[in-house]
Amino acid sequence: MVTRLSGEDGFVNDDIRVRYTRFSRGGVGLLVLEAMAVHSAKSGPLLRISSDDFVPGLSDLRARCHDAGPGKVIPQIIHFLKISRSGWRQTVDLLSLDDLDAIVDAYGAAAARARACGFDGVELHMAHAYTLSSFLSALNRRKDDYGGSLENRLRLPLRVVERVRREIGHDFTLGVRFVGDETIRNGYTTVDASLIAVRLARAGVDYISLSAGGKFEDARVIAGEPLYPYTGYSGDRCMPGSHYPDGANLYIPKEVRAALRAAGLSTPVIAAGKIGTMALAEEILQTEQGDLIGMARALLADPDLPKKWRAGKEEQVVRCVYGNVCKSLDENFRRVDCTLWPKKLGQAPESTDEIAPRWAENGPNLRAGTKSGAVVLQWDRATDNEGIYGYQVFRGEQGGVLVHRASVRGVSTRYEDARVLGGEKYRYAVRPYDLAGNRGAMSESIVVDVR
C-alpha cells in the first residue's frame, strides 16, 4: 500500500521514515516498502529508485527500519504506463520494442540499486493496472511476440526476471507480486495464474505474492481526472471492503499454491486480502492455503498487530474495519492515513502497558431500542488515565458468536445499526479502548428482538 508521503520528487523524507520505522517496531517479519518507480515518470508523491540519486535516502531508510525491528526489509519496484486527466491512457500495444528493452534495463538497474542500498531483497510489482501486469493480462492483444498467447504475454515479465536475477545474483531474495484473478470481463483467472506462477518459479523467483483485480478496464471515469484503477468491481476485489467476507480472495493462493506443489515446486506463496484475525491467519497456514500472510490495511490500523499476536494480546489489536477510507485517500492523491488513528496524530499511537479502560462500578448499563427499523444502542461512559478514544461494538446473529461490527470514536456512547431484519434476534456487546489501543473489558451482552 502506498503512503503518498514522499514529495513530488520521489525522495525519502521524514514522513516516510516515521511511517516505515513504525511498521518495523511492530514486529513484522517482512516489510515490503511501497511501490517505487524504476523510471523517471510523473507519479505524484510516490517513492522512486530510478537513479543513483535515490540511493542515499533509501539506504538510510533501510538502516532505520533494520534498527527499529527484527524483520527483513525489501522494496517493491514498479513501472507505470502513462495516463492523463483527459482520460487517455497508454496501453501495451503503443510500446515499441525499444520501449520494452528500456523497461527491462530500468528494472535491472533499479534492482541493482536495491542491493546497493543494503536491502534484503527486491519485489517486482507485476500486479493490477501497471505495465508488467498489463502484459500478463488476457486483454493484451499485441500482434507480435509480446501479446496474444500466454507464452507471449509472459515474455516481457520473464525477461525482467532474468535481467534482475543477473544484476542481483542468486544470494539476494527476488519476489514477484502479480494478480491471481483479473476479475474483469475476459480477464484471466486462477487457471492462467497457476501457469504464470509455475513459469515464474522455474525462472528463479524466490516467492510469489498474490493479489486480485485493480484494473483500469472497469475503473470509474470522472471527467478531468486521471483514471484510478481501484474504483470498479476489480478494485473492490483488490481491497475487499466491509461488505466482503474475511479472506475473500483465499481461493487464489490456495489454487496457485496447489499448482506449484503439483509441479514439484516449493516456492512460498503469500496470501493476502482482508486477513485481519489471528484465527484466520493460522487457518490459512495450517490448511496450506498459503505459506506467508500478507497484510496492508490491518497493519495500517495497528502496526503492533504482529507483536500483540505473539504476546497473546489479540484483544488489544486495533482492528481494521475495512471501510477503505485509506483507499479513498489514495484515490484523491492525499496522504494515506487510517481513520482509526487519533485525529491530527498522523500516525498509529504507540502501544503501552498502561492500565486498560474501566467501566464505572455499576458497569456500562448497555441498553437498546428500535427506531425506524434500526437497533439503537446506548451505554454509560468508561474511564481511563489516557482518555477514552472510542468503543468497539460487537454483534452476534441468531445465537452466533459476537464479531466486531463497528467502532464508535470520541465521546459518543451511541450506535445505530440499520442492517437488521424484522423478526430476527441480535446480540450486542461493547468494549472501550484508549489512545494507546488498550482494550477494556467487554460488557455483558444483551439480546434485541427486532419487530
PLM regions and their residue ranges:
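Recognizes extended acidic, P/S/T-rich segments that occur
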Residues: 390-423, 435-436, 441-442
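Conserved beta-strand positions that form and line the central face of beta-propeller blades
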Residues: 145, 365-367, 378, 392, ...
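Residue-level signal for secondary-structure boundary sites
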Residues: 6, 83, 184, 385-387, ...
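Pro/Thr/Ser/Gly-rich low-complexity, intrinsically disordered linker/stalk tracts
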Residues: 354-386, 422, 435-451
